[in-house]
Amino acid sequence: MNLRTRNTLGVLGALLISTGSAVASPSQQTLRFKVFLDQSPIGEHNFELTAGDSGKRVVSRAEFDVKLLFFNAYRYRHESREQWRDGCLERIQATTDDNGTDYRVQGRRIADVLSLQVNGKSERLPACVSTFAYWEPDFLKRPVLLNPQTGELVDVKLEAQGWERKRFGGREVDARRYRLRADDLDISLWYTTEGDWIGLESDTGKGKMLRYERM
């Protein structure tokens, strides 16, 4: 698994809107994505979004297993708990097992900075930071995003790619495609006319395509 593949999985593992989801209340949503490597299913990435007086809380859980013949060639586990207010990240606590390499990220916004610890190392970031929050279309406006696995700030460039037909909820729907690029990332995202995130594809850099399909 090369660096570009790990970066792709890491950012997607941060990875994170309503149509077809299981809704427990008007303020809570659950988003479930089946994840494929080319045509082979490798796991799921699920999100729990809860809105309240204190802002929005997001819990993201990903489990991927890439098998080669009868062996598990790659294992990825990620869990992130984020608290948001006014479009800015207030708190984050994330743990990742990237095929045996562990990452721990903890952060809290204090005054005009986001105080972050990555594997015990302290950093100070700007106060209003966004992760790769695909569940919130406004994140597409940000030129810099936080990788919740590594704690790194990533410069990104977004291009609108026009409208396409995508299958979602048992039918074909109009979906707007965006292309998000960084040094080691090339990601396509699809949103419905209502702004619901329904799909993702990313080139892993080794001739394989990582793909999210909304369940």
Residue ranges of each PLM-predicted region?
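Bacterial N-terminal signal peptides
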Residues: 10-19
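Acidic, serine/threonine-rich low-complexity disordered tracts
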Residues: 24-111, 115-120, 125-215
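Bacterial N-terminal signal peptides that target proteins for export
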Residues: 1-11
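Long, intrinsically disordered, low-complexity accessory segments associated with secretion
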Residues: 3, 17, 23-24, 150
